Amino acid sequence: MAGSKKTNRREEILQALAQMLESTEGASRITTAKLAKQVGVSEAALYRHFPSKARMFEGLIEFIEEALMTRINRILDDEKDTLERIRMVMHLILAFSERNPGLTRILSGHALMFENERLRDRINQLFERIETQLRQILRERKIREGKSFPVEERILAAQILGQVEGSLNRFVRSDFKYQPTANFDEYWALLSAQIK
């Protein structure tokens, strides 16, 4: 029972942090005092569940990594067409961000500007993992479909991920007015025409 209550409180703290990141408070630095007030506990109670604020952010980053990488792997298992795989991975990241605006502040690095550098490193590593997956998908086209691209796969992967990151940054910069998936089909038509 006590373990379950501790897990629930940890989740409650992480959910409160994500909600604060989504609100106007997320545009500025979130203190443990503000977070404790949001959760309805003392700062000391926060530290019983997490040794530091950085560990709270790491908890959210772990959730983001798990959610995105699990779904990307599922796409790779289920879909074999190269361009469809790329389209689905792009849409996955954009839709995830749209559904989780507070977490998008973490993905864009905005929420981590004044936090521990290792948090920014974790997000950079996540994007590097995604870019590596994109490069692999693009490389496999020769094997799967007997076709190659007019440009190196590493350049295409960087261009694709740059499009995604630009959409995430625009979403955060606009205070979540410009939805990342808005006009996705048109953007995809433009991008896929360039890389076919």
Curated annotation (Swiss-Prot):
Job description of the protein: Required for nucleoid occlusion (NO) phenomenon, which prevents Z-ring formation and cell division over the nucleoid. Acts as a DNA-associated cell division inhibitor that binds simultaneously chromosomal DNA and FtsZ, and disrupts the assembly of FtsZ polymers. SlmA-DNA-binding sequences (SBS) are dispersed on non-Ter regions of the chromosome, preventing FtsZ polymerization at these regions.
Coiled-coil region list: 110-142
UniProt subunit comment: Homodimer. Interacts with FtsZ.
Upper taxonomic lineage: Bacteria, Pseudomonadati, Pseudomonadota, Gammaproteobacteria, Vibrionales
Family: Belongs to the nucleoid occlusion factor SlmA family.
Domain called HTH tetR-type: residue spans: 7-68
Organism of origin: Vibrio campbellii (strain ATCC BAA-1116)
Gene: slmA
Single GO cellular component term: bacterial nucleoid
Alphabetized GO MF terms: DNA-binding transcription factor activity; transcription cis-regulatory region binding
PANTHER family tied to this protein: HTH-TYPE TRANSCRIPTIONAL REGULATOR RUTR (PTHR30055), NUCLEOID OCCLUSION FACTOR SLMA (PTHR30055:SF183)
DNA-binding region: 31-50
Pfam families in alphabetical order: SlmA-like_C, TetR_N
Taxonomy, superkingdom: Bacteria
Protein name as annotated: Nucleoid occlusion factor SlmA
Keyword DNA-binding on entry: yes
Keywords for the protein's UniProt record, in alphabetical order: Cell cycle, Cell division, Coiled coil, Cytoplasm, DNA-binding
Entry's Gene Ontology BP terms: cell division; negative regulation of division septum assembly
Compartment annotation: Cytoplasm, Nucleoid
